[in-house]
Amino acid sequence: IGVRLVGSEMCIRDSSHVADGIAAGIKAAQHDGKFYVMALGTGSSLTAVYEELIRRYQEKTLSFRNVVVFNAYEYYPLQQESSLRTINQLKERFLSHVDVQEQNIFSLDGFVAQDAVQDCCRLYEQRIKTFGGLDVALIGIGRSGNIAANEPGSGIQSVTRLILIGNTSREEMEASEQTKETIPPCSLTMGIATLLSAKTVYLTAWGEEKAEIMQKVVENSITDTLPASFLQTHPDAHVVLDLSAAAHLTRIEHPWLVTSCQWTDKLVRSALVWLCQKIGKPILKLTNKDYNENGLSELLALYGSAYNANIKIFNDLQHTITGWPGGKPNADDTYRPERSKPYPKRVIVFSPHPDDDVISMGGTIRRLVQQKHDVHVAYETSGNIAVGDEEVTRFMHFINGFNQLFADSKDSVISDKYKEIKTFFAKKKESDFDTRDILTIKGLIRRGEARTACTYNEIPLDHVHFLDLPFYESGKIEKLPMTEKDVEIVRALLQEVKPHQIYVAGDLADPHGTHKKCTDAVLAAIDEEKKAGAEWLKDCRIWMYRGAWAEWEIENIEMCVPLSPEELRAKRNSILKHQSQMESAPFLGNDERLFWQRAEDRNRATASLYDQLGLACYEAMEAFVEYK
């Protein structure tokens, strides 16, 4: 199985390798006067590949007139008015933008009668053979290792068939489908044998959330509990990952186990932390024998002894710890992560949603405020679709009651709007999207919670900025493309505040992609300011936080802010101000813990790791990486 890494640490999804292979196959088939037969999935990781193929078609360097497409799977059973048909998604994302002939597009029938399902599947297999078999299969991967809709337990001999959708896949599908319609219980899917019959197979995966499963697929033994692992048996299978999705592969995470290394400070730190965890010792107790017995003899040659390497990495980690995230005034900052001057600093904390600031760095925000820095918080999106309908109902009951109590129900706008929204919710179907008025009310609820949290953290309300970036306001899970308008809104705030410190989300495992888009908007605005020669940028540092969906690996941490038990409690209180995001919040992800519990667990785990390595023992720690 061939593994190709593309992109950078900031998850640039370069799909040209896959597009090159497909384009070459199409052109070769055209030269020979043959069809080029493709099995195509609809996973989000394939979007970038489809966009690249569309670009080549639009530039007139590639035609798809000889291409035959077979949809890899379809939901079953579908209602006639269903918006869930995967073939429609495939057309919307790809096929309708190129010149594939309509008569050459085939899909399994999600409407077929149950007693005709087997015949439908058998006919699909025969039709593939009629065209000479599959030339290429282009697929993504689910969290359980499923490919197409082949759930764990699917055998290597399995062919096109009806299969029950597993709970993990269902959760993933519900999160990714751009509709509130209930996912059907089953799928009609190409089998493992069908996919492996393709001459070439491409599997693409992007992002941190795929790192764990990709390590198992590529490096673990073949097993039917991990259907994608059967790709190891294919003579021309290509796994294409970005660095985030490849993060747990041995060659990336522990390269010293497979090759000689170029030993950077970060890699040495990673190796020593791994060694400490493997043998259960703190850094300063590691010996030459420990290094030699665990494949790290190169470091002994580099540093001369275990003692020298231990001291170097211990000091590096020690210097990441600071109780002064804005820099300690009038102090030697040689070994501190932040400079002492200027003091006080102007700080902007960019928060993708209206609670990410306190979830990810609530303790650090309080510390910055207490140490007299000029702290601004910028909430980049409204977060409106993450508010449940019952929250709107509760607030509408309140305002209607307020109208009755103090205005004798004379405010007809409130009365009419109350009745209108009450009627809408009473008739609302699962697949219905909210009206613009309801989305506005939901955004207002989140604004109120954010203001309450900021007041609790002693941030003046004139330092609280609601940017409402336009890309978010689709009313759906899938957002609009980021545009210059989004960037200009962020840039205007930067020009107004002229910060010495900027905090942005580095939590790119957010399953809906909002964090990445928000961070991209900030970095794009900074690039524009750089081009314009902005003076304030010469004395500004950018720090990236995590916490809502993942935590920084210790080899990457450059600043770690310790929290006492009291400070951790205050952080929890800040998060709890966001009441709409507690148990009933729509998008808690596949982690059953509430966000305050996730944050505390991650912060405590970071502190525990520092303690195990022989450094100071704290209740919790918030970690940051500098963006350079």
Please identify what each model-predicted range represents.
Residues 1-7, 12:
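Single conserved hydrophobic/aromatic residue that forms the stacking wall/gate
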Residues 148-192:
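Class I SAM-dependent methyltransferase SAM-binding "motif I" and its flanking Rossmann-like core
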Residues 190-193, 199-294:
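ATP/nucleoside-binding phosphotransfer catalytic cores, i.e., glycine-rich phosphate-binding loops
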Residues 49-55, 147-159, 512-528:
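Short Gly/Thr/Asp-enriched flexible loops that form oxyanion-binding sites at enzyme active sites
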Residues 40-45, 139-143, 206:
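Glycine-rich beta-strand-to-loop/alpha-helix junction loops that act as flexible
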Residues 49-60, 358-382, 386:
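Histidine-anchored nucleotide/phosphate-binding helix
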Residues 4, 62-136:
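Ligand-binding beta-strand-loop-alpha-helix segment within the catalytic cores
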Residues 172-178, 182-187, 279-348, 367-371, ...:
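Metal-dependent de-N-acetylase/amidase catalytic core
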